[in-house]
Amino acid sequence: RHRSVPNARSPPSPLSPMPDDSKPALVDANIFLRHLTGDVPEQASNARNLLERAERGEESLVTTVLTVAEIVWVLESVYELDRSSIRAKVVAILGLPGLTVEDQEILLQAIVWYEEKNVDFADCYSAAWMEHHGLEEVYTFDRDFDRFEGLTPLRPE
């Protein structure tokens, strides 16, 4: 039943160098969290300054899927925000000018499903990744995958 997936890997991220050929810098979750929450005022101000420099083209920034997943987890578990608020904040991050985000389309679908289906973000990302790559079957014991149209959860025997 297992099928080979020749193109299941994501293509390399398009990391565009700045005009002076410098490489982009990775932005960690805490920078986004300070920016989004405003707590630790000095750090929040510094985070905003960094993101504004990127918006003006003075900095080239990148972030990863795992960073976005960490942001979702912290906003949910530490800040106890509702899913709608978390979705709005993640969409704002994904739309920041000057920031390249790994698998941005997949993340956008995942955060929509996170709010709509009340499924944990990691499962939403996996379902969105599957859809993006044309996969339909997932081996899992997790019943949450039953909520995704077009996916067939398989229970190993």
Language-model regions, residue ranges each:
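Short, well-structured N-terminal submotif of metal-dependent ribonuclease cores
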Residues: R1-T63, V78-S85, V91, P156-E157
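Structured helix-beta-strand junction loops
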Residues: G57-E58, L96, K117, F148
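Acidic catalytic patch
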Residues: V65-L66, K89-E116
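Acidic, metal-associated active-site segment
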Residues: D120-E137
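Short loop/helix-cap segments at secondary-structure boundaries that form the rim of catalytic
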Residues: D144-L151
